[in-house]
């Protein structure tokens, strides 16, 4: 079973630092560092976390990223909701069975996270990721 559970909300926009400061102050969030892979995604991001471990990723909006990288789904344009799962292959199989297009990014932006992006019927971007051992 893949056991999807909410993990983070990704907010993309132009005023990244200002937006991060707003959410940090408004929701009493703590800044955290993620182990980044700059070759996969080099933009500066702000990552905040609440007391329960739910994260907020504030990133620059990049609507052309998917086209430049030949992807059907843009993982960094417009923001997304993310679910952590135990079995990314089960999610991939379910999306295939439902005929849903997706971008399987593998481990590309955050070390140890295999990320896959799809859209819901309204076009909202959804991320599923599994923590994997890279060792």
Where are these regions (language model features)?
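N-terminal beta-strand motif that seeds the catalytic metal site of vicinal oxygen chelate
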Residues: 1-20, 78-83, 132-135
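Core segments of cupin and vicinal oxygen chelate
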Residues: 10-55
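A short, acidic/glycine-rich surface segment
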Residues: 32-34, 42, 64-69, 104
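Active-site beta-strand termini and strand-to-loop segments that position acidic
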Residues: 46-52, 118-121, 131
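Conserved beta-strand in the GNAT
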Residues: 56-59, 117, 127-129
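Vicinal oxygen chelate
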Residues: 14-17, 74-125
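Short beta->alpha transition motifs characteristic of CBS
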Residues: 33, 128-135
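Short, charged/polar surface micro-motifs in flexible loops or helix N-caps
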Residues: 51-55, 62-65, 88-89
């Amino acid at each position: 079973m893949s056991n999807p559970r909410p993990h983070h909300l990704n907010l993309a926009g132009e005023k990244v630092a200002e937006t991060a400061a707003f959410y940090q102050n408004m929701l009493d969030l703590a800044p955290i560092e993620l182990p980044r892979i700059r070759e996969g995604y080099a933009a500066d991001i702000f990552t905040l976390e609440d007391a329960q471990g739910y994260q907020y990723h504030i990133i620059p909006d990049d609507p052309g990223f998917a086209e430049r990288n030949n992807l059907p789904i843009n993982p960094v344009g417009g923001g997304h909701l993310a679910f952590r799962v135990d079995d990314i292959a089960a999610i991939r199989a379910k999306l295939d069975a439902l005929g849903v297009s997706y971008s399987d990014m593998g481990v590309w932006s955050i070390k140890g996270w295999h990320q896959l992006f799809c859209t819901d019927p309204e076009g909202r971007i959804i991320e599923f990721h599994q923590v994997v051992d890279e060792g």
